């Protein structure tokens, strides 16, 4: 996230904590331009619910050459950080539930978190109706049966991502086919 999304992130966190009071969370926040005040706000919020916030500051060169496309001018380059979770998070974390910082959680997320991943890359919400009519699979050149998905909620198998170099695959695809990327990180994933 960046400073502009701290307020939204706080709402997401409160909805997560309030609707999952029996769970203990470590929230991993990836941010480049958060002030100490911003961090203190989110850390205090997590602490109020007996949870923990950890912060990761990616290298600025990680997104060198990346741009925000289409009509998504409300997004920042920070949107691409989810592609690099396997590189940014500590090696001892083998799975992560990625949540966009502008969503509201209305119930128990435990069933989603406990979804077996086995050898799968992860779990995502398919049939993104906002992009359905665009036939993204044709433009991105992947089989239609693989389904385009919304990248706002992702349960990610970090072991698989690390073993299969998913972060590097995203970079390689972006640099090889930049003209195909319209929906930013979502197209890469």
What is the predicted function of each stretch?
Residues 25-33, 123-126:
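Short internal beta-strands
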Residues 99:
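Catalytic metal- and UDP-sugar-binding loop of GT-A-like glycosyltransferases, i.e.
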Residues 37-88:
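Active-site-proximal specificity loops/subdomain of glycosyltransferases
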Residues 124-131, 146-189:
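Catalytic core and acceptor-binding pocket of nucleotide-sugar-dependent glycosyltransferases
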Residues 96:
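Short aromatic/hydrophobic "clamp" motif used to bind/position activated sugar donors
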Residues 103-139:
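Conserved donor-nucleotide/metal-binding helix-loop-beta segment in metal-dependent transferases, i.e.
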Residues 6-20:
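Histidine-anchored nucleotide/phosphate-binding helix
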Residues 40-43, 91, 106-118, 167:
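Short alpha-helix within the catalytic core of nucleotide-sugar-dependent glycosyltransferases
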């Amino acid at each position: 996230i960046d400073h502009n999304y701290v307020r939204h992130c706080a709402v997401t966190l409160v909805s997560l904590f309030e609707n999952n009071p029996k769970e203990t969370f470590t929230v991993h926040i990836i941010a480049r331009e958060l002030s100490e005040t911003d961090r203190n706000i989110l850390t205090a919020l997590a602490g109020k619910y007996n949870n923990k916030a950890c912060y990761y500051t990616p290298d600025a060169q990680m997104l060198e050459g990346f741009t925000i496309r289409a009509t998504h001018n409300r997004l920042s380059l920070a949107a691409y950080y989810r592609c690099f979770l396997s590189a940014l998070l500590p090696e001892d974390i083998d799975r992560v539930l990625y949540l966009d910082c502008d969503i509201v959680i209305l119930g128990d997320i435990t069933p989603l978190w406990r979804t077996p991943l086995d050898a799968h890359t992860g779990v995502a919400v398919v049939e993104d109706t906002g992009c359905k009519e665009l036939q993204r699979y044709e433009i991105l050149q992947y089989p239609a049966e693989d389904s385009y998905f919304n990248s706002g909620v992702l349960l990610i198998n970090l072991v698989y991502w690390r073993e299969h170099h998913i972060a590097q695959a995203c970079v390689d695809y972006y640099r090889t086919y930049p003209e195909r990327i319209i929906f930013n990180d979502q197209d890469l994933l």
